[in-house]
A protein has these predicted regions:
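Residues at structural and domain junctions
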Residues: 27-30, 62, 66, 112, ...
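Non-catalytic, alpha-helical, charged scaffold/linker segments
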Residues: 50, 56, 61, 67-75
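Thiamine diphosphate
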Residues: 4-59, 70, 74-425, ...
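Detector for methionine-enriched segments
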Residues: 65, 152, 180, 216, ...
């Protein structure tokens, strides 16, 4: 294409094709969705003058292909080997670890300073944890779909990745969620650890790429913020409702929705330890960092945050920011003399991987079980039943957090009264 070679402007190269050329169904939709029969395959081979041997590639073709690959890439390979030879021992070791996919990730000490007022948003904690990981783990690279200031998914003190600076840790993907997910899969195939980020309501734009992440078992970290109806006046377009249920249904994919700073740290520890496809779902509102939440228990999927003081009468399961609301409900019910247990379930898929003994210990059968989550009820029927879920099965509303919560009945007073009524039935 001499014209393309002589121009630095965008070029469209159009190549005319005929679907199913040489087949009896040439030029029709039949050849698109149906396999060719043996007779058709035979006559195609006769037309092309090729041997009638199944799956045969001649040595001549193989040799030509190998020569072509070497002609195109030989210089690049030689240049790469020369650059590797010039590396110091530390860099050579890191390169070997990258190629062998054996670089250890140490998250014993997270560089997170707990705020004086004891409150922080999980998206803010996530940003600090990502940067803490980046200090000790050179293979972390990622970015967002033009919303890093909102999702906090950005590595500080490093340049943006570009042609001129390929060592940059941040990638400016632009508002291109689908491409972002696909690029992350490619990066993961090189044994780097990519993270990508956008608002949770926009996760549907990259669902195809994310599904392939799970199919290929790639350790891509999906970071989604603005996780519920409490994100403000942007309204239903920015308020995810059905997304959590959909994510929890994806095979070979772990979805984490941490309640506070402790669980956010625990989510990242689990993600990096397991090296599996995963998403972390984050809130934008500051929430209390609970004394009894445990980062070490997140990998189990669910654990007891508050145990019943007297005989167990009811269990409340919750996730994300709703733990703060649930704790208020718990306090009131305990004061009234009810035996209530609070279970935080940051990851449903991780909980389902635990032993039957552990699951029975956390959620014993025969106990009235309630759910509090600002999301669809669809993923919760395994643990409870209709009428015991404080969830949302409609689109959200535009308004501030308190007004929207009130409109959907998400206040401690409303929920506490309904749970008390159910306990007495």
């Amino acid at each position: 294409f001499p014209t393309r070679r002589s121009s630095d402007l965008p070029t469209i190269i159009e190549i005319k094709t005929i679907i199913g050329k040489f087949s009896k169904s040439e030029g029709t939709c039949k050849v698109h969705g149906s396999p060719l029969d043996l007779e058709d395959i035979k006559q195609i081979k006769e037309k092309l003058d090729v041997r009638d041997i199944s799956f045969a590639i001649s040595q001549e073709v193989q040799n030509k292909m190998n020569d072509r690959i070497f002609d195109r890439n030989g210089k690049s390979i030689r240049d790469w080997k020369e650059k590797v030879a010039l590396l110091d021992e530390k860099k050579k070791q890191e390169l070997e670890q990258l190629i062998d996919n054996k670089k250890p990730v140490k998250l014993i000490d997270i560089d997170y300073e707990f705020p004086e007022d004891g409150k922080d948003s999980t998206r803010n904690v996530s940003g600090k944890v990502l940067n803490s990981i980046a200090k000790n783990y050179p293979f972390l690279i990622g970015g967002s779909a033009d919303v890093s200031k909102s999702t906090m998914a950005r590595i500080v003190n490093t340049q943006n990745n570009s042609y001129l600076y390929p060592g940059g840790k941040n990638i400016n993907f632009g508002i291109r969620e689908s491409a972002m997910g696909a690029i992350a899969n490619g990066i993961a195939l090189s044994n780097l650890t990519p993270f990508v980020s956008t608002f949770f309501s926009f996760s549907d734009y990259l669902k195809g790429a994310l599904r392939l992440t799970a199919l290929m078992d790639l350790p891509v970290i999906y970071v989604f913020s603005h996780d519920s109806i409490t994100v403000g006046e942007d309204g239903p377009t920015h308020q995810p409702v059905e997304q959590l249920a959909a994510f929890r249904a994806i095979p070979n994919f772990d979805t984490y929705r941490p309640s506070d700073a402790n669980e956010t740290i625990g989510s990242y520890k689990a993600i990096l330890e397991l090296r599996k496809p995963a998403a972390i779902i984050l809130g934008r509102n500051k929430v209390k960092i609970e004394e009894k939440t445990k980062s070490s228990d997140v990998i189990k999927g669910a654990y007891i945050v508050e145990k019943e003081i007297k005989e167990l009468e009811g269990i409340i399961i919750t996730s994300g920011e709703e733990l703060e609301l649930t704790m208020k409900v718990y306090d009131t019910l305990q004061e009234k003399g009810y035996g209530i247990r609070i279970v935080s379930m940051p990851s449903m898929s991780r909980f389902e991987k635990q032993t039957d003994e552990y699951k029975e210990k956390i959620l014993p059968k025969g106990i009235k079980t309630f759910v509090i989550e600002r999301s669809s009820s669809l993923s919760w029927y395994k643990y409870t039943k209709e009428g015991y879920m404080f969830t949302i099965d409609s689109f959200g509303k535009s308004g501030n957090k308190n007004d929207v919560d009130l409109a959907f009945g998400f206040t401690s007073d409303i929920i506490e009264k309904e749970i008390e009524r159910k306990l007495n039935e």
